[in-house]
Amino acid sequence: MVVDIGTVTVAILAGSVALVVLRYIQARKPVSNYPPGPWGLPFLGSLLQFQTDHQRYFMKLGDKYGGVCSYMFGGKNVVILNGIESIKEALVTKGNDFADRPENYAVTLYNPQYLGLFDAHFNETWYNQRHFTHKTLRGFGFGKTSFESKIVEEVEFLIEYFKANQNKPVDIRNFITNCVANIICSITFGQRYDHFEDPAFLRAMNCIRDWFTAAGSLTLQMGHIFPFLKPFLGKQVGAVHEAAGKLESFLLAQIAKKQDSADATEEPRDFIESYLQQIKEDKEGKFSLLYLKQNIMDLFAAGTETTSTSLTWAVLYMMTHPDVQENVQKELDEVVGREKLPSYSNRGDCPYTEATLLELQRIISLVPVVPHATTCATTLRGYNLPANCEVWANLWSIHHDPKLYPQPEKFDPRRFLNEDGSLKKNESFMPFGAGRRVCMGESLAKMELFLFFTGMLSQFSFAIPEGTPPPSLEGDLSVTYMPKPFEVVIRERI
Ligand code: HEM
C-alpha cells in the first residue's frame, strides 16, 4: 500500500486540532450546568478580551452573564462572582465549600509550601496557625482598646513628620507605611524602630509594596497560565525573590534574636516569644519555626500595606475633596477640639467622619478581587462547580453596584448617613471579605484607620501643590488597589 505523506500530515494536523478543541471544550465546561461565560480560543481562552483593571472588566462580565460566571485564562478556568447575592451565598452561606485558596505561580516563589495565614489551603494546619495567632495577638491587645496607646504613639510620630515637612510638596507613602509597620513590630517583636535611623527596618518595610506589585503583576499571572513562559520571566521572578527575601531576612533576624535571649521562666512579652514557647510545649509537631516565619510574613504583608495604602488614599481624597475635608475637621473640632488627639471612643460621636472612612473604603475597595477555591463539588445560585475550582470574589462589584450605591464613582460620605445625620447601617459592604477567610486584622485595621485619619485631619489640612493638576484618582491593581505616586502639601491648622 502506498502511503501519501500529504494525506498523513493532514490527518495528523486535523487530529491534533480536534484534540486541542476537545480538551478546550472539556476545560471550558468541566461539569454539567457550569456557569456561563465568554467563549474564547483554544489555548488562549478569552485572554484577548482581557483588560488590566480586571475588577471593572469582571463587572461587565457580570452584567452580561450574571452574578456567577466563568472565564478562561488560557487553559485555566476561573469562576467569577459579582454582586452581593452570589458573593454572600459563597463566602457566608456556603462558607466551608468556598474556603480554600487557589495555587498560584507567584505564591510558589515566596511560599512554595503554602504555609501561613493567607495563602494556606483550608485545612487543619491553617486552622491551628490562624487560631493560635489570633488568640495570642488578642492576648496582647490586638484590636482592643487597651492597644490604642500603641497606635496613638505612631500617630504622634506621623504628626511630627508632617510638621517637619509642611508647606512643600512631599510624597508621604513610605512614612505612613513605616508608622503602620511599627504597630505590627510592637505586637510581634515588642519593639518599634526609628524610621530614620534603622536601615534594615527601612529596607524591609519599603519592600512590602514592591513585593505586592511584583507578585500581583500580570506578567507572573501569565507564567501561571502558560508554564512554558516561566524561563522568560527571570526579571519578575527576581523582583519577587528580592522583595520578599529582604522582608524574610529582617524577620528571621528578629526570630534569631529572640531565640538567643529566650528565658524559659519569663512570661512571653510578644508574639514571637509566645510562639517559641508554643513550639517547646507542642508534642505533635503542629508548630515550627517555618510556620512562625510565614505567619509573621503574612502579618506584615497583610497588616501593613493594606492599612497604609488606605491611609494614603485617604490623604489623596481629602486633598481632592476639600469640602469633605472641611466637614470632617469641623466635626472633630466640635467633638474633640484641637488640643488633644481624638480617641477611639469618640467615633460614636463623629458620624460624618465615620461615614467618610466607610465611603473611602467603598470607593477604593482596597482588595478588589479575593481569590478563593472550592473545597468540594458544590452548587452556587443553581450552577454546578467542581471541587478545586478557582473562584474570584469581586468585592469591587458590590461597592460599585449602582443599584446599591447610585453614581458609584462619586465620593460622597453622605450615602452612609441617615437623614438625621446618624450613621446608616449597610449590609452590602465588605471591604474585609466575609466568612471563614474573613480578614484576621479587621478590628485592628478599623482602629488604625480611625485613629490615624482623625489624628491627621485634626492637626493638618492637605492640598494639591500649587500649579499642578489634581492627582489621578485611578489606581493601579496588584494584590491591592494602589494610588499612583503623588505629592501633597501639608499645612498645620492654626
Ligand atoms: C484596611 C485594612 C485591611 C483590609 C481592607 C483588609 C482586607 C482583607 C481581605 C479582603 C482579606 C481576604 C478575605 C477573604 O478571602 O475573603 C483579608 C485577609 C487577611 N487579612 Fe486583612 N485587611 C486589612 C488589614 C489587615 C490587618 C491590619 C491584618 C493583620 C495585622 C490583616 C490580616 C489578614 C490576614 C492574616 C488575612 C488572611 C485570612 C485567611 O486567609 O484566613 N489584614 N484582608
Model regions and ranges:
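Conserved cytochrome P450 K-helix E-x-x-R motif and the immediately C-terminal K′/meander segment
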Residues: 47-66, 249, 342-381, 402, ...
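Cytochrome P450 heme-thiolate monooxygenase catalytic core
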Residues: 101-110, 144-311, 327
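C-terminal helix/juxtamembrane-tail motif
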Residues: 1-6, 13-16, 274-277, 390, ...
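Conserved cytochrome P450 K-helix/beta-meander segment immediately N-terminal to the heme-binding cysteine loop
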Residues: 393-421
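Classical protein tyrosine phosphatase
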Residues: 34, 80-90, 96-99, 191-201, ...
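N-terminal membrane-proximal hinge/A-helix region immediately C-terminal to the signal-anchor transmembrane segment
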Residues: 2-114, 124-128, 152-160, 243, ...
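Cytochrome P450 heme-binding "Cys pocket" and the immediately downstream C-terminal segment
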Residues: 99, 322-324, 442-480
